[in-house]
């Protein structure tokens, strides 16, 4: 596996490749990330991964400086997955001058849920993903469903900008107790780690309620928020939305069996966790 930081060297290395499968990451890789590499291999060859902690998608009070950086461990894991190239640029490589041009998602998708609680987050994501796509020029790119809203925004962005890349969705990988794998799980204390699977269990109860015929979605959402709050969580949102566009479903759509997803974000101690479950 080649480890490359220069955009020009990356382009030289990939020249002539027309089936490249790309997996962008911020590093601190876990089994969820590695499953993306394996899925990428099913859809293209060679597989290219990137590791770049993107300052643009962190808010002023977020964890950019303490975000785990484990490059050597990550390299070893990617080598075992037979990744062809790891693109690991520095900030100077990616942003040699102030990034004044940004890619802004529409408010109807980028300003809700995560976008409401993390202003500017999706503009940072869209900008860096567009730039990475320009560098790698893949045929397919793989994103995890754990970041459901991000997946939808990136997919729509590629369609709207006519980027010649297919976005592949990968299922969320969970620990044995149901907790969705995340680089931020390492921030949890021992007691918090024991409590953390309750987020997934709460989403499962919401899902069961909808499938059981409950049509008062607001009641289901409020019950779930209250349940987590009583256990010491600080929920940002628990919301049932249409899978197609993350808009709240109408009563008619509910009766017609509209495909739904319940999404959640909540703080447990100092750690903010997100999860979702399709219904």
From Swiss-Prot:
SUPFAM superfamilies for the chain: Nucleotidylyl transferase
Leader peptide range in chain numbering: none
GO process terms (BP): pantothenate biosynthetic process
Active site positions: 33 (proton donor)
Positions bound to beta-alanine: 57
Top EC group: ligase
Pfam families, alphabetized: Pantoate_ligase (PF02569)
Residues that, per the record, bind ATP: 26-33, 144-147, 173, 181-184
Keywords noted in UniProt: ATP-binding, Cytoplasm, Ligase, Nucleotide-binding, Pantothenate biosynthesis
InterPro entries named in the record: Cyt_trans-like, Pantoate_ligase, Pantoate_ligase_C, Rossmann-like_a/b/a_fold
Record-level GO cellular component terms: cytosol
Reaction equation(s) it catalyzes: (R)-pantoate + beta-alanine + ATP = (R)-pantothenate + AMP + diphosphate + H(+)
EC number(s) on file: 6.3.2.1
Record: residues binding (R)-pantoate: 57, 150
Biological function: Catalyzes the condensation of pantoate with beta-alanine in an ATP-dependent reaction via a pantoyl-adenylate intermediate.
Oligomer status and interactors: Homodimer.
Family label: Belongs to the pantothenate synthetase family.
Protein name: Pantothenate synthetase
Species for this entry: Burkholderia ambifaria (strain MC40-6)
Lineage, highest ranks first: Bacteria, Pseudomonadati, Pseudomonadota, Betaproteobacteria, Burkholderiales
